[in-house]
């Protein structure tokens, strides 16, 4: 009590105000007594009061302002003035071949710091940045850890010809971001418009992603370790019918509804007879017999009466696990520094059977040596090893899902009474995967080394920089298919497939690149800032792809080419290539008083992929900026921190074509017959004539942008609108006369216009919880684009179908053409009367071309008396109409992060607001038994299918092959409008 009384006697009430440099009171400023948890915050007038001792030091902090330390002393009233923290505007952002301060950037450039990535821990870098940057669309085909992603910047399809995706550079060298260790990343910059990507020329036609890895700091040696264990769960588990009786009844309805006759077998491996069905129904309806799932028929073969076999559950787990370990060592002294990191990641597979496993090892070593005051040498070595073991079925295409859908009937069994495999176990692939002798092994090595030499010719004025990079990649894929024995009766052994086999594909890639540039930053009067950079770049890439294979293992389970007795082959296939790029680039940036900004940049590119007379192209750009917030009429408005307008215009080339498109090539193939113990090689005439003048695709972009920071940088806004004209796209041209025997030649035959916008709105703030600061940030992003074909040399005007893309002038990319459905027939009489009116209709309900109640009724929109697609051309499309668009629209991202008392929390959402989709015929989890009668039976279809008691159902009467036509209809969406 005495001690407490003494402390209270020394404390006193201290009050004060906190204001900005402009004299505006600041609300919510945190005032904390250093070394304690005692503190307070300012009110709406910027005032505060707290108990403090004369020796106490007050820490005053506020978002967007520099923190201050104020000693209490003998004062009881304090006046604190905080100055704005210009770090946000002074932040250094990595751009092409250099860096720039954010305040001076006039191109469309976005940046993500390492701190943001740390708040979104993920084993895969690209998943950590999904939804973070407007205009960046990251697409992954599936969740496999080995799968590379597609990165498109601005527009989902940049070109219908050469195609391509963003150029991804890791410390200036092209690399695979999927294989990168996220812990190594210092920052990520995304260059989106022609102005910011111009120095990369044709290599940056689709935008550029620049990843900078962490560098060593000149400090004592430190060792950091981090590890994690993850549980990875499936996002959606398909809902399908496992009740045998329901599945079988639907199968018979679908099969007979289309073919109008009884089956002889269910998908060619499960025998069907009328006597089998009679017995099966008896067992299903007789409780005393239903447990008997098999018996021997008169020929001594098994008759199966399986019940409720859940094949999907037999194959797939609901979740799996992964673990990773990271270690980093760094340190340095006055003249040198180093950093080395390593990571091991392992993820188990999703199959219950087979030992599916993915492993990845990353290692990086980076060091810098200051040899003299003006000479610095840096070396960066990166190594990645990935291995992926996948159990597979009886075929090398790994179509586990398709096998399961088409052979995994609930009425079948996995094993026979004697423990042998059933035919169903083999045809689904379950037996192969369980035995573990059929698999695909992928092994990939990446080694990359970059050496950089920097010479300060005139300190901070004239800097020369040169680098050389070498990348070596070796990948090997080994497909092993072993025979599995099943039985369809006691003592009967059948091996499947007919022969065991092994196929090996090896790819070796070597990549060399060299860069040299000179940067000049003259010492000018304070109001002026200038930087001029010019450089040279050369790249060479060579790939060799070899395939080999052999059939017939002498010893099962011993996949070795020397232990096989079949015919073997070795060949180098068309995936081998060799190309080179060379470019000369420049950039000049100027700023006047920090508010008037201008930049000129460009590149002169040459590529070996084009004929000698078309190999070179010049791609310039220009951009200007105006920091309106620095004008006198706005400079003193305290709540405005930055308002900057940006405008850019530029042109980029696209050289993403095959290296040999301008050459007349002959394909060599192996004959299908064996002569004198070997397969003969043969060739034929070229399939098409050469393009007359193959040259660069080019894209010209205009961009208008606005950057806004308000309320002490707590509120931020970034917006861009742009138009991109892509010309000379590499597509097929006009059809040649049939007498030539050639298909239409490829060439620069199409143009496309893309218009779009990007906006993001962010809020960053803090307040106190339990006398401790709670920091949080929210960011909302929205972006969209639409592309129109403005020129198409081929005048065939063919319309797209489910399985074939087609284009025409004026077409919006992603258009879906299809038939309209006006409803379902109510009675057989109505259906048959409609069918008799046009015996030449395109759509029929089955092999006998009859219509019944519950069938789809198509609209004869052109009133021709026939429902058809004419010649499937724009000028003769019959009853086809535009019924949707498959292009994703209105991409959005929502990001929220917070931290308090050492606890970090982050959540994000990303998606698209609108997209039409038409499931193709093999989309079994949508179509179910409307596709193949023996496919999945889907509960949501069963609950909303036409019947006499449910005439207003969504789904028509059940019959197979409804989903097989190549032209979509408006009958598969809730609004009766489907996609192709």
What kind of feature is each model-predicted range?
Residues 328, 775-777, 885-913, 973-980:
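Conserved C-terminal beta-signal and adjacent last beta-strands/turns
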Residues 1-348, 352-363, 376-378, 773, ...:
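Short, small/polar-rich motifs associated with maturation and membrane association
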Residues 102-103, 199-201, 219-220, 233-236, ...:
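Switch/connector loops and helix/strand junctions flanking conserved nucleotide-binding motifs
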Residues 117, 164-165, 366-385, 393-394, ...:
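Extracellular/periplasmic, surface-exposed regions of secreted and cell-surface proteins
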Residues 158, 173-216, 235-245, 253-255, ...:
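Outer-membrane beta-barrel proteins
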Residues 233-234, 315-316, 638-641, 788, ...:
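C-terminal beta-signal and adjacent terminal beta-strands/loops
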Residues 224-301, 547, 766-884, 926-928, ...:
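Conserved small-residue
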């Amino acid at each position: 009590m005495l001690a407490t009384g003494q402390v209270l006697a020394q404390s006193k009430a201290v009050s004060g105000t906190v204001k900005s440099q402009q004299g505006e009171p600041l609300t919510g400023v945190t005032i904390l007594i250093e070394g304690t948890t005692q503190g307070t915050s300012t009110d709406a007038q910027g005032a505060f009061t707290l108990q403090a001792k004369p020796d106490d030091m007050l820490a005053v902090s506020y978002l967007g302002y520099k923190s201050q330390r104020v000693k209490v002393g003998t004062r009881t009233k304090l006046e604190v003035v905080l100055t704005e923290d210009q770090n946000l505007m002074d932040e250094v952002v990595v751009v092409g071949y250099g860096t720039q301060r954010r305040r001076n950037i006039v191109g469309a450039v976005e940046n993500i710091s390492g701190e943001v990535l740390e708040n979104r821990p993920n084993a895969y870098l690209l998943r950590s940045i999904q939804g973070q940057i407007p205009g960046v669309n990251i697409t992954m085909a599936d969740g496999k850890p080995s799968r590379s992603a597609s990165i498109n910047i601005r527009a989902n399809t940049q070109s219908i010809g050469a195609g391509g995706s963003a150029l991804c550079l890791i410390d200036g060298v092209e690399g695979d971001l999927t294989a990168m260790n996220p812990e190594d990343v210092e920052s990520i910059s995304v260059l989106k418009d022609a102005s910011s990507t111009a120095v990369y020329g044709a290599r940056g036609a689709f935008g550029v992603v620049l990843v900078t890895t962490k560098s060593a700091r000149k400090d004592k040696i430190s060792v950091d370790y981090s590890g994690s264990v993850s549980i990875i769960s499936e996002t959606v588990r398909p809902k399908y019918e496992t009740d045998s009786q329901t599945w079988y009844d639907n199968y018979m309805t679908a099969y007979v509804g289309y073919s109008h006759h009884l089956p002889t077998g269910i998908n060619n491996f499960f025998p069907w007879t009328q006597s089998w069905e009679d017995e099966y129904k008896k067992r299903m309806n007789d409780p005393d017999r239903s447990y008997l799932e098999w018996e021997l028929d008169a020929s001594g073969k098994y008759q199966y009466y399986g019940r409720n076999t859940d094949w999907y559950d037999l194959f797939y787990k609901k979740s799996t696990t992964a673990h990773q370990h990271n270690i980093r060592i760094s340190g340095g002294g006055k003249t040198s520094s180093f950093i080395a990191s390593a990571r091991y990641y392992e993820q188990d597979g999703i199959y219950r059977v087979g030992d599916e496993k993915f492993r990845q090892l990353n290692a990086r070593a980076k060091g810098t040596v200051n040899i003299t005051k003006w000479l610095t040498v840096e070396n960066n070595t990166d190594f990645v090893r990935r291995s992926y073991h996948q159990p597979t079925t009886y075929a090398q295409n790994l179509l586990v899902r398709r096998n399961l859908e088409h052979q995994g009937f609930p009425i079948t069994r996995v094993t026979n009474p004697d423990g042998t495999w059933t035919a169903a176990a083999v045809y689904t692939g379950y037996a192969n995967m369980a035995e573990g002798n059929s698999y695909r092994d992928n092994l990939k090595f990446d080694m990359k080394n970059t050496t950089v030499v920097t010479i300060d010719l005139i300190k901070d004025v004239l800097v020369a920089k040169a680098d050389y990079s070498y990348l070596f990649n070796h990948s090997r894929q080994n497909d092993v298919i072993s025979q599995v024995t099943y039985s369809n009766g006691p003592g009967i052994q059948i091996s499947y497939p007919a022969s065991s086999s092994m196929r090996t594909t090896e790819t070796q890639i070597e990549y060399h690149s060299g860069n040299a540039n000179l940067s000049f930053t003259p010492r000018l009067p304070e109001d002026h800032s200038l930087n001029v950079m010019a450089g040279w770049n050369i790249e060479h890439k060579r790939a060799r792809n070899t395939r080999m294979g052999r059939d017939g293992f002498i010893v099962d389970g011993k996949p070795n080419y020397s232990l096989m007795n079949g015919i073997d082959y070795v060949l180098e296939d068309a995936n081998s290539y060799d190309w080179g790029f060379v470019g000369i680039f420049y950039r000049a940036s100027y700023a006047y008083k920090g508010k008037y900004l201008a930049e000129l940049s460009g590149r002169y590119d040459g590529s070996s992929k084009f004929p000698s007379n078309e190999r070179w192209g010049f791609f310039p750009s220009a951009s200007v900026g105006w920091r309106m917030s620095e004008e006198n009429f706005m400079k003193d408005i305290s709540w405005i921190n930055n308002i900057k307008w940006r405008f850019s215009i530029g042109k980029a080339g696209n050289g993403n074509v095959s290296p040999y498109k301008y050459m007349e090539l002959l394909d060599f193939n192996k004959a299908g017959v064996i002569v004198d113990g070997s397969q003969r090689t043969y060739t034929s005439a070229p399939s098409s004539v050469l393009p007359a003048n193959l040259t660069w695709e080019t894209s010209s972009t205009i961009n208008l942008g606005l950057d806004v920071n308000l309320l002490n940088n707590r509120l931020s806004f970034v917006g861009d609108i742009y138009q991109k004209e892509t010309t000379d796209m590499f597509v097929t041209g006009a059809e040649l006369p049939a007498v030539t025997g050639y298909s239409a030649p490829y060439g620069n035959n199409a143009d496309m216009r893309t218009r779009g916008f990007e906006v993001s709105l962010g809020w960053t703030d803090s307040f106190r919880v339990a006398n401790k600061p709670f920091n949080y940030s929210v960011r909302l992003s929205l972006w969209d684009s639409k592309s129109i074909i403005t020129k198409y040399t081929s005048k065939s005007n063919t319309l797209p179908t489910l399985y074939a893309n087609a284009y025409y002038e004026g077409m919006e990319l992603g258009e879906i053409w299809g038939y309209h459905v006006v409803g379902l027939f109510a009675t057989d009489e109505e259906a048959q009367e409609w069918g008799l009116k046009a015996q030449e209709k395109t759509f029929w309900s089955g092999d006998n071309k009859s219509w019944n109640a519950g069938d789809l009724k198509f609209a004869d929109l052109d009133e021709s008396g026939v429902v058809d697609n004419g010649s499937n051309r724009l000028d003769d499309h019959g009853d086809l109409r535009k019924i949707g668009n498959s292009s994703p629209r209105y991409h959005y991202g929502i990001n929220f992060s917070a931290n308090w008392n050492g606890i970090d929390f982050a959540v994000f959402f990303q998606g698209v607001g609108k997209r039409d989709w038409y499931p193709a015929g093999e989309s079994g989890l949508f179509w179910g038994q409307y596709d193949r009668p023996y496919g999945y039976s889907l509960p949501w279809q069963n609950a909303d299918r036409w019947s006499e008691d449910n005439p207003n159902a969504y789904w028509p009467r059940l019959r197979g092959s409804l989903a097989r036509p190549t032209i979509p209809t408006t009958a598969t969406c809730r609004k009766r409008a489907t996609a192709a």
